[in-house]
Amino acid sequence: MAKHDRGLRFQPAGGSRAPQIPVGKKQRLTIQRLANDGRGIAFVEGRTWFVSGALAGEEVEARVLGSHGKVVEARAERIFNASDLRRPAACAHAGRCGGCSVQHLPHDEQLALKQRMLAEQLSKVAGVEPEAWAAPLSGPEFGYRRRARVAVRWDAKGKQLEVGFRAAGSQDIVAIDDCPVLVQALQPVMNRLPAMLRRLSKPQALGHVELFSGSALAVLLRHMAPLSDSDLTILKDFCDFHQAQLWLHGEGEPQPFDPSQALGYRLETWDLHLAYRPGDFVQVNAGVNEAMVAQALEWLAPQADERVLDLFCGLGNFALPLARQVREVVAVEGVATMVARAAENAASNNLHNTRFFQADLSQPLSAAEWADEGFSAVLLDPPRDGAFEVVRQLATLGAKRLVYVSCNPATLARDTVELIKQGYRLKRAGILDMFPQTAHVEAMALFEAS
C-alpha cells in the first residue's frame, strides 16, 4: 500500500547561525544540477538553493519561499536562458499548483530523473545495484489520475468560495477548474464543480471535495453543517447530470446518498472487481496499477501448487490476482477495516483460496498464526516508512522469491541492506511511473534467496 508524496524537504546539518533570507526576496541564480526531487540546485555565498521550476544550466530569477540555516527554498519566476530540455507546461497553473512539479521537463527526462534517484539510493545506502534493470513501467503522462481531492475554503474577507488545489509549499488555494492529469471522465465534473458549490446555502461550512473514477464516477462532499433540502437538490442534480454517485461526509463516516451505491475498480486482466470506500487506499493511476500487478506476478513467477504471502495487502490489489494462479494466498494488513474489505472482495469474486489477517507488521512474526507453515514466495507493498521489522524476519518463512513494491526508494534501499543480510540477492529492480509530472518515485525489486 502506498502513499501519495510531494517532494523532499532538505534540512541543514548542524546549528548554523546564518541570518535568514527574507521570504519574497528575489535572487539571480545559475542552476548547477537537479536534485532528486526535480528542483534545481544553486550555490550562493555558502548557501544551497533548491529552486522549483528550474533546470540544470539555466540562469533564473527565483523568489525565496523559506530558508533554514544555509538551505534556501525558492521558486523560479523568470528564466533568462532556458535549457534545451525545457518544454512549455501543459497546465497554466503548473508553476503554482502543488500537484505537478516537473511539467516543464520532458517525460523521458522525468523517467531518467526517477531512475537516477532509485539507482543512487541503492548504491549509496545498500552498496548494490540489481543484476538487471527493468525498463520503466509507465503509461500516458496526462489524463491518468482517477482520484483527486479538491480544496474548498471560504474567504471571509473577500466573501467568496475558493475552489481548486493547494499551492506548492503553501495552504493557499490555486483556483483551478481544469486539470490535465485527471482522467477524461472527471474533466467535465471538475469544470463545473466551482460554480455548483457556490450555489449552496452555507459555503462557509464546506470542506473538501473528492472525485472518483472507477466502476462509476463519484463526488464526495465534506460538510460541517447540515445541508438544506435545496442544497441536496443542487448536489443531486449535479451528480445526475454527470452520471455520478453522490457521497456525503458530515458527522461520522462518508455515506452514499443512495445506499445501494458503492465505489470500485476493475483489474481487467484477471476479471476482478474490487470494492472500496472513501478513505481506503487505492492507486490513482489505473493503467500503471494494472501493469504493476502484472509485472509483480511475472517476477514472482508463482506456481499452481504454491503458498504465497502478501504483506500490507490493502484491498487485495495483489492478493486477488495471485489467488487466480496459486494454491493459497495468505494476506496480511495492519488496518482492520481494509482486512474486512479485502475478504469481502475475495468472496464477491468467488475466490476461496485466500485467507486475510489483521496484524501489526512492526512486531515479530513468529507468534502469528499464519506464519507457521512457510511460503514459497512473498510479496510486500509497505507504506513510505518501509518494512524494516518484517524484512528482518523474512528468512524464517523460507521464501525463495520476494517482490518488494516501494513508494520510497530511501526505505527500499535501507530494507535491501537487511535482506542481503538475510541471504537474499537483488536480482532486478525498476521504477514505476505512477505519478507522471511529479518527481515522486515508486519502484519494484525482485530478491531471490542465495
From Swiss-Prot:
Key word 4Fe-4S present: yes
Chain segments carrying region Disordered: 1-22
Ranges for domain TRAM: 20-78
UniProt keyword annotations, A-Z: 4Fe-4S, Iron, Iron-sulfur, Metal-binding, Methyltransferase, rRNA processing, S-adenosyl-L-methionine, Transferase
Residues bound to [4Fe-4S] cluster: 91, 97, 100, 179
Enzyme class (EC, first level): transferase
Pfam families linked to this entry: TRAM, tRNA_U5-meth_tr
EC number: 2.1.1.190
Protein residues bound to S-adenosyl-L-methionine: 283, 312, 317, 333, 360, 381
Cysteine disulfide links: none
Gene3D superfamilies, per database record: 2.40.50.1070, Nucleic acid-binding proteins, Vaccinia Virus protein VP39
Active site per the UniProt annotation: 407 (nucleophile)
Catalyzed reaction equations: uridine(1939) in 23S rRNA + S-adenosyl-L-methionine = 5-methyluridine(1939) in 23S rRNA + S-adenosyl-L-homocysteine + H(+)
Any GO BP annotation: rRNA base methylation
InterPro entries: 23S_rRNA_MeTrfase_RlmD, MeTrfase_TrmA_AS, MeTrfase_TrmA_CS, NA-bd_OB-fold, SAM-dependent_MTases_sf, TRAM_dom, U5_MeTrfase_fam
GO terms of molecular function: 4 iron, 4 sulfur cluster binding; iron ion binding; RNA binding; rRNA (uridine-C5-)-methyltransferase activity
Protein's UniProt keywords contain Membrane: no
Functional summary from the UniProt entry: Catalyzes the formation of 5-methyl-uridine at position 1939 (m5U1939) in 23S rRNA.
Family note: Belongs to the class I-like SAM-binding methyltransferase superfamily. RNA M5U methyltransferase family. RlmD subfamily.
HAMAP family, alphabetized: 23SrRNA_methyltr_RlmD
Protein name: 23S rRNA (uracil(1939)-C(5))-methyltransferase RlmD
Gene designation: rlmD
